[in-house]
Amino acid sequence: MSGRFGAGPRLGAALIAAALALLPRAARAQTDEIQVYNGEIAAPGVLNLTLHDNYTPDGLKTPAFPGAVVPNGVLNGVPEFAYGVNPGFEAGLYLPLYSVPRAGGLQLDGFKLRALFVEPDAAKQSFFYGMNFEFSFNSKHWDPNPYTSEIRPILGWRLGKADIIVNPILDNSWKGISHLDFAPSTRIGYNLTPAWAVAAEEYDDFGQIRRFERPNAQSHQLFAVVDYTGKPIDIEMGVGFGLTPNTDRLTLKLILSRDLN
């Protein structure tokens, strides 16, 4: 899954208005889904299932807030159900978000809804764009805020076999514009064949836009990624390395995806 934008200035104006309506409520980045949206969505009438999993063998050992999931040794994941409504719109449901701590047991973390608007046929465009709106309902150990949301613009360029994609994300905890959190993700990929690609991805969290965190308190993680697109299932796997003290030192991610009809 990933994003493309609807066609024409009328849709663009509607998306901008929707984004502005969301801004008065700020957020924090999620850790169940480690992915750069690339402008591609399910075809109209198609139901797609994507399984997101990430495991942190060497992560932060202190909770982000009292009672929070401690990242070290935890497996986080979620099934994502996506339905292609039309060539420029995909609706999604993430259910259930879950964590499996190193000590064992299963923790349910909540669920998410999303609306992804994109430029149709993004895979065939030299420049593509889109906008994702996400609404999260969180368990107390997953996020201190019971409701959060995400505003994810999508900008991408295809340069021959290379791709450059930027998602300048604003996480929103519904506490006002000044509390919006800037957590961009970036991907530079190279398509070895129509089925195989390699990429470098960076996931960052600078903190709230009213005042970014000090550099050593920010989160910056660099992933080496391999993608396979084809039958019977699409696969994305990667290894991430923390670049700052406030980042998990080592994270493994696996994303499996296929159409169900």
Predicted regions, residues:
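N-terminal signal peptide c-region/cleavage motif recognized by signal peptidases
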Residues: 24-26
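Transmembrane beta-barrel domains of Gram-negative outer membranes and organellar outer membranes
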Residues: 28-261
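Low-complexity, intrinsically disordered regions enriched in charged/polar residues
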Residues: 16-17, 30
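Bacterial N-terminal signal peptides that target proteins for export
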Residues: 1-15
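Hydrophobic alpha-helical transmembrane segments of integral membrane proteins
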Residues: 20-21
